[in-house]
């Protein structure tokens, strides 16, 4: 598969263009049942190496999102992806950006899951429980307020 993002004379990318191009490629790979694929890293005007890396990871992780846990037991599609042609001097920075982007995408997926849950499953108490669980799993602190705490902050 080859994705051409812009005409050569318009070689200035927006991050969202790259995310969408990668996501389309991932969706096509899923249709074709391809589990291993490569993405050729191309430096573009307007995006730094970290921005390009982040966009690639977001496109990969978010393309396969579906909230269908009540419909079937289908697994989330996530192929093995290799990024080729990256500048050697930027590899360490890219590794760091890949992990950051994975964490970002996981947070986006969690938010999408929470928004898509029906109200008889996700009500204030269960939302608080899930927030605490996410905090423990990801290493951040969660403070759950009761109604009295909330009223104190409204003054």
Walk through the language-model features, giving the residues of each.
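Short amphipathic alpha-helical segment within the helicase RecA-like ATPase core
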Residues: 1-155
């Amino acid at each position: 598969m080859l994705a051409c993002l812009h005409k050569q004379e318009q070689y200035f990318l927006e991050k969202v263009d790259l995310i969408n191009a990668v996501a389309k490629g991932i969706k096509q790979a899923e249709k074709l049942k391809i589990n291993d694929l490569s993405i050729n890293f191309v430096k573009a005007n307007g995006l730094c190496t970290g921005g390009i890396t982040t966009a690639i990871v977001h496109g990969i992780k978010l393309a396969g999102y579906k909230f269908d846990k009540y419909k079937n037991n289908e697994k989330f599609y996530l192929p093995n992806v290799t990024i080729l042609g990256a500048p050697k001097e930027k590899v360490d920075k890219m590794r760091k950006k890949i992990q950051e982007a994975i964490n970002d995408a996981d947070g986006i997926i969690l938010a999408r899951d929470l928004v898509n849950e029906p109200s008889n499953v996700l009500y204030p108490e269960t939302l608080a429980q899930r927030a605490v669980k996410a905090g423990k799993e990801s290493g951040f602190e969660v403070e759950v307020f009761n109604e009295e705490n909330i009223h104190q902050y409204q003054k």
